[in-house]
Amino acid sequence: MWAFFHRYKITSAQIILVGFALVILLGTVLLMLPVSSRAGAATGFADCLFTATSAVCVTGLVVRDTATHWSFFGQAVILILIQIGGMGVITVAAIITMVSGKKISLMQRSAMQDAVAAPQVGGIARFTGFIVRGIFLFELLGALVLMAVFLPEYGPKGIWLAVFHSISAFCNAGFDLMGTKGAFSSLTSYAENPVVNLTVMALIIIGGIGFLTWQDIRSNAAHLRQYRMQSKVILTMTVILIVFPAAFFFFYELRELPLKRRIWGALFQAVTPRTAGFNTMDLTAFSEPGQLLTTLLMLIGGAPGSTAGGMKTTTLAVLFACAAAAFRKRENGAFFGRRIADQTVKNAAAVLLLYLAMFLSGGMIISMAENLPLLPCLFESASAVGTVGLTLGITPSLGTVSRLVLILLMFFGRVGGMTFVFATLPTKENPHSRLPLEKITVG
């Protein structure tokens, strides 16, 4: 297959796009098999396509309850799709190549670099190995901790539940097997359980800060000054985007609840929208400001080169830094004594516009197609394009047009805005001559 890509000059972005599409198609076919459902009957193509897309794109939006509709085989297929989606299709392909003893070509290395947002091609195979070891280590630790809760309650079945939820949390997928306690109930029955809350939140955060950040933490530990600027920005934004939303949920949204439930609820609700999709609270009971804040968090997402989606914390940070520079009449935005490259600013602006366009158009189309109020439709749209999985309860009742919109949004959100554009639009080399410069008034 790599020879085919090389012969027809397929770009790295196009390889990523095609790779995700092929895995989704394969997952759809497997889920359509009668053995995949508890009833032993074939599930319709549309529902299987939606579920496979949601799993590969690590979103978590579902039209069929994962616990009650799908058999063990179907759940295993979904879990494998989540793992492939979280690791990245190209990363999985590279692992298979390395395990088989074959040499990784330059084209494969370039695709791997784009897939994990690595700064350079050199050492990418070693870095990929580091990523894979880290993923399975964290997922194993998460599963072992969750077994302490699920084994006493469910018996041997608790092992499967622990493994499933650990992988789903680390990959920021949001799929759950708690439907036996109530359809689409997610983790609401564990809203005050500290072990489940802390473990799931930790897995979400670790999976969402990015693989390069892991490398910095492993290499430099507490020596923060030696971290890459990107890692510093990611960790700073992660703290900010947990602390301030948690304060809002604690002091305003959940102020009527008992103290213990407020604490865990506020923390969990600040973490899960970026971009896991588990919930321990009834989101339909939230006020409009609470739903709006959750929508914004879903759009922001996690870090680049991570299991999280969204337009990324670094995108928001770059735009804020450049806005601060403009307010102070400085030429460049900066972080930690380093200037931000002009191309980075252009990319950040492009990503913001892409996500806003997809988010707003998706919400409007769903609202018009379903004759529903705009806010819950925008919430659904943000959840899909941010690959989150939170919903205000409208997903299972949506029609064909709306489901197709969500499928496209999930796919766009997982492959990444810039990757999607680079893969679908022809690129032109910069002309040797530069056009005349002229100022234009903005603001």
Q: What would you call each of these model-derived segments?
A:
Residues 1-443:
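Membrane-proximal intracellular helices of multi-pass ion channels
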